[in-house]
């Protein structure tokens, strides 16, 4: 089951990115005292009281100005809220309640999501309650005074968030239907591939539009399995895109990636893997989606009996961070091998949803440690892995309980991930490893101890 999402919203310069970094225990979100630094939404994993979830950072909301990037920022916030289980509205306790805060609150009342108000910049515990009091008028219950910089009050905020999140064992969506996003640069043959699917399969639902801002889905059925296919906008380099319909179409494509079970990354074999293909592949991995690499226009490529192996080697050299994704060579124009794509989709989705028993995980860890012991510092402190367990699926995610996460460098973390893949498979899906210190439950409740490989 995918991790539940918590959207962090608010007007510019109230400290949203600082709060995200505090909740996720990282510094990935860019922080600057100039409004509008965050434009795209960014996702980070967080952990609190045995619950894993995702926090999404959004740009500052401004409703009365349509200049420059502001419409895009609003669109990003709407997309974040649409996929979130709840939202945290961040306000500035030093500035007090503003007209912009009220305008955002009016908008949130129509979004049908639980809302928690976090009154940031309450650095003084003595004054925090008084600073937060005036935000009762927003109508979202008790406002919580916090300091994102110092961490005070964030434990109470996280407690409130967990109260409102859906139960951990609650199913997310209809797992009998497989969502497939067809993504790639312009003119690589995405629409031709969709048409080829429709020519081969029986369409059982007319194209369904969600809102006017959503991509159009097409549902097909094959061997009693339903697939929801999304043909996304071609994704180009940012400097080649005007801030108009195409720009918003591309952002809807990114949303399609996040809500899909599996992405078909379509590559034009005549062009090879471009820089933009690499960035798109990175987005798929970052969002934790299963993936099949579809190499299109194979009919137009000159070849002999060994060509396919050489071409695959060249493509994989450029897509090394998707080395876990299967690759298939097709021609959407002629239909060559298109029918085999859905077989690959079934396989990778099964791996994406797969669970592994704790005993098996710890057997893999034991073998890995026997082959290569954890590193030791110059002061003689050695890393110790006590045990591991799977915490979620889609993508498969594991928590490793260790004496101190800081003792495990990137090299050893990558080694453990390789051992997981060699022993457990997981073809077609990324995996996540979280490293948690044994004393994490005793530490100050302001920072996340789980770190992603």
Swiss-Prot record:
Residues 354-439 form the KH-like domain. InterPro entries: AAA+_ATPase (IPR003593), G_ENGA (IPR031166), GTP-bd (IPR006073), GTPase_Der (IPR016484), KH_dom-like (IPR032859), KH_dom-like_a/b (IPR015946), P-loop_NTPase (IPR027417), Small_GTP-bd (IPR005225). Pfam families: KH_dom-like, MMR_HSR1. GTP 2 binds at residues 184-191, 231-235, 296-299. GO terms for molecular function: ATP hydrolysis activity; GTP binding; ribosome binding. Residues 4-169, 178-353 form the EngA-type G domain. GO terms for biological process: ribosome biogenesis. Keywords: GTP-binding, Nucleotide-binding, Repeat, Ribosome biogenesis. GTP 1 binds at residues 10-17, 57-61, 120-123. Belongs to the TRAFAC class TrmE-Era-EngA-EngB-Septin-like GTPase superfamily. EngA (Der) GTPase family. GTPase that plays an essential role in the late steps of ribosome biogenesis. NCBIfam families: GTPase_EngA, small_GTP. Associates with the 50S ribosomal subunit. This is GTPase Der. The lineage of its organism: Bacteria, Bacillati, Cyanobacteriota, Cyanophyceae, Synechococcales.
């Amino acid at each position: 089951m995918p991790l539940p999402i918590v959207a962090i919203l608010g007007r510019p310069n109230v400290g949203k990115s600082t709060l995200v970094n505090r909740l996720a225990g990282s510094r990935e979100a860019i922080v600057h005292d100039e409004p509008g630094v965050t434009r795209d939404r960014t996702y980070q994993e967080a952990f609190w009281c045995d619950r894993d979830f995702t926090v999404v950072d959004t740009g500052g909301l401004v409703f009365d100005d349509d200049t420059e990037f502001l419409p895009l920022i609003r669109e990003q916030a709407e997309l974040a809220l649409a996929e979130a289980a709840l939202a945290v509205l961040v306000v500035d306790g030093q500035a007090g309640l503003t007209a912009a805060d009220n305008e955002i609150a009016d908008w949130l009342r129509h979004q049908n999501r639980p809302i928690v108000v976090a009154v940031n910049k309450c650095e003084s515990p003595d004054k925090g309650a008084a600073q937060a009091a005036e935000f009762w008028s927003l109508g979202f219950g008790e406002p919580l005074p916090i300091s994102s910089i110092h961490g005070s009050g964030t434990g109470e905020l996280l407690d409130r968030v967990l109260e409102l999140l859906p139960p951990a064992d609650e199913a997310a969506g209809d797992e009998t239907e497989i969502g497939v996003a067809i993504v790639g640069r312009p003119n690589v043959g995405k629409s031709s591939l969709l048409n080829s699917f429709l020519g081969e399969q029986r369409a059982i639902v007319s194209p369904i539009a969600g809102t006017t801002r959503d991509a159009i889905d097409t549902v097909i059925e094959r061997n009693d399995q339903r697939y929801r296919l999304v043909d996304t906008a071609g994704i180009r380099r940012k400097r080649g895109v005007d801030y108009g319909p195409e720009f918003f179409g591309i952002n809807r494509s990114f949303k399609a990636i996040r809500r899909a079970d599996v992405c078909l990354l379509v590559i034009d074999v005549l062009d090879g893997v471009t820089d933009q293909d690499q960035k798109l592949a990175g987005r798929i991995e970052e969002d934790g989606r299963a993936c099949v690499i579809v190499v299109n226009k194979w009919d137009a490529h000159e070849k002999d009996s060994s060509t396919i192996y050489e071409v695959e080697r060249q493509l994989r050299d450029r897509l090394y961070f998707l080395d876990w994704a299967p690759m298939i060579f097709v021609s959407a124009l002629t239909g060559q091998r298109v029918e085999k794509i859905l077989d690959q989709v079934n396989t990778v989705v099964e791996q994406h949803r797969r669970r592994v028993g704790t005993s098996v995980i710890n057997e893999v860890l034991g073998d890995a440690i026997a082959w290569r012991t954890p590193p030791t510092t110059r002061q003689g402190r050695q890393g110790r892995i006590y045990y591991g367990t799977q915490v979620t699926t889609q993508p498969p995610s594991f928590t490793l309980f260790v004496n101190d996460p800081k003792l495990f460098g990137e090299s050893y973390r990558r080694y453990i991930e390789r051992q997981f893949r060699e022993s457990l498979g997981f073809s077609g899906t990324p995996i996540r490893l979280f490293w948690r210190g044994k004393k994490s439950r005793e530490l100050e409740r302001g920072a996340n101890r789980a770190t992603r490989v």
